């Protein structure tokens, strides 16, 4: 895990004294700024590679990055997509069928009762005011928990939200005055989750469902779930001039058109494959899986063996178990 504290990270210490020279040198020498090139220059100048990458991006014609740098309300690149900023951008979204679920995740939030108790234990000997607010928050969560056997939908949760707002303000004030204390990382993570919960609640409308449930670990969770992310995604898409969604699996297309954007005048283009189906050979290795629970060295080895045998022998001699 990266710690951006200048007292710990040599790349963070004095970063701003050296980064301008690093960016200038990079722009003079390189046209294709790959990960390897950026890391090499960052190491040479002892600057933060991530921050240098962001600075360099303002000179780039094409930028390749993950969805979250455009769509995630917590980590989007503010230098490009801050409120009120519209750029001369064209968004090319690959594997767009994944954006629906990712959009739901990015615009949803959860509050876990057990996390409140964990932070309360840390803060009890340090701040009676915070411990008291955590107790109020926990009491409200307990009331919701008693209503919930397995799954419970709530129309609204105003009392909990007001309690969370008071709690977030007190934690923020305490951490500004106390930069170091045992358990600070746990409290900081909880604070960010709490802030995200409050920020997402401001977006809650008819496209959301608020519900409580017991998760797989038995913890009680209240979730602000974004069922339809199209309006939130559209806010981001409006920061550019146009968007093209690519995917080989955007079917049924009307489903994706309705959940990826709230515009009604979008159109779909079906592109035929350039490969002849007469030359297609379908081979199935049914002893391997890409499921997360099956991702082991042995599984990787079997998959790699299939790939190797496929590219090194004629298909007429390829046998599968």
Where are these regions (language model features)?
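Gly-rich Lys/Arg/Thr-decorated short loops/hinges at beta-loop-alpha junctions or inter-strand turns
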Residues: 33-35, 279-292, 311
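Charged, amphipathic alpha-helical oligomerization/scaffolding segments
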Residues: 91, 136, 159, 163-166, ...
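A contiguous, basic/glycine-rich beta-loop/short-helix subdomain that forms a polymer-engagement track
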Residues: 41-58, 74-81, 179-284
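Signature of the SF2 helicase/ATPase Hel1-core->accessory helical subdomain module
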Residues: 45, 50-62, 67-162, 250-258
């Amino acid at each position: 895990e990266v710690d951006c504290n200048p007292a710990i990270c040599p790349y963070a210490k004095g970063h701003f004294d050296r980064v301008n020279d690093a960016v200038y040198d990079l722009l003079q020498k390189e046209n294709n700024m790959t990960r390897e090139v950026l890391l090499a220059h960052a190491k040479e100048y002892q600057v933060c590679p991530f921050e240098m990458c962001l600075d360099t991006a303002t000179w780039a014609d094409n930028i390749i990055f993950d969805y979250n740098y455009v769509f995630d309300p917590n980590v989007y690149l503010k230098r490009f997509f801050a409120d009120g900023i519209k750029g001369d951008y064209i968004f090319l979204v690959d594997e767009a069928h994944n954006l629906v679920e990712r959009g739901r995740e990015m615009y949803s939030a959860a509050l876990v009762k057990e996390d409140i108790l964990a932070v309360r234990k840390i803060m009890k000997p340090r701040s009676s005011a915070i411990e008291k607010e955590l107790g109020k928050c926990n009491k409200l969560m307990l009331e919701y928990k008693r209503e919930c056997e397995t799954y419970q939908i709530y129309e609204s949760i105003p009392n909990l939200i007001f309690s969370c707002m008071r709690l977030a303000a007190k934690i923020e004030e305490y951490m500004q005055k106390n930069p170091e204390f045992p358990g600070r990382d746990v409290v900081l993570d909880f604070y960010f989750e709490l802030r995200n919960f409050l920020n997402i609640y401001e977006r809650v409308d008819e496209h959301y469902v608020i519900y409580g449930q017991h998760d797989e670990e038995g913890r009680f969770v209240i979730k602000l779930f974004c069922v339809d992310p199209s309006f939130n995604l559209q806010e981001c898409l409006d920061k550019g001039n146009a968007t093209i969604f690519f995917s080989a699996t955007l079917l049924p297309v009307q489903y994706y058109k309705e959940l990826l954007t709230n515009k009604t005048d979008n159109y779909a283009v079906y592109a035929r494959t350039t490969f002849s189906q007469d030359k297609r050979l379908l081979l199935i290795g049914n002893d391997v899986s890409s499921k997360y629970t099956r991702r082991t060295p042995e599984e990787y080895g079997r998959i790699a063996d299939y790939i190797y045998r496929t590219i090194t022998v004629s298909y007429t001699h390829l046998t599968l178990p």
